[in-house]
């Protein structure tokens, strides 16, 4: 029996050592599916390397003696092999598959499903503002990658859900919805800078916070905004209050997280991701 037990114990020790050596960031954030995050090891370097995915710069952080790229994977990404570029070299990584459920919503305001021509002009202007914010890339290192919940409350709608409004399919749900009362304070989940404040056709009152290197939080449908563009925020500071402005059926807190201009599942950053 001891002779049989020794190899088994050695194998267990090897597996435990391998797990322990895995990066904490990798273990926590690496969810490489459409709408998820890939953590790619860039190796050691004297200073922070730069990397790009789909031509866009990605967040790079150091952990122990190596640099890691934290790559946002868009919902439109096909499963298979994707490629990160770092200077002249390319780094492949695998993207798995994930099936997202459907959600059917009935809206009384038909214009919020099929906007009128004047609405469409407004929507186009507002979209251009928001795209510019999502593509912001400041040099700062995020204060924390494991984020705080902006509010305490149950989830009412998950990320990636295929949405049908009055029977017509529209864009997938690009964030998390929390079922909390109107007026609930919304707190920034990490240090950041307010880069955009607006009152939009679909999103209602909205705030974008840049946490550094394309790591962006967006909060919308707010009843009140308590910050201004350019304001620097510390983790836990209030950005505004929960509401139901824009295309909303009732009060809730909607939170988007974006990496390299890809909307990704905020649940990954609060330990609530479900494969």
Feature map (PLM): residue ranges:
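Positively charged n-region of N-terminal signal peptides that target proteins for export
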Residues: 1-6
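Catalytic cores of peptidoglycan-degrading enzymes
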Residues: 148-275
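Bacterial N-terminal signal peptides
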Residues: 7-17
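Cationic-aromatic interfacial patches
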Residues: 22-99
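Short, charged, solvent-exposed linker or helix-capping segments at domain edges/interfaces
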Residues: 53, 103-106, 267-268
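Intrinsically disordered, low-complexity acidic/polar segments
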Residues: 49, 60, 78-80, 102, ...
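Surface-exposed, glycine-biased beta-strand/turn segments
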Residues: 26, 92-203
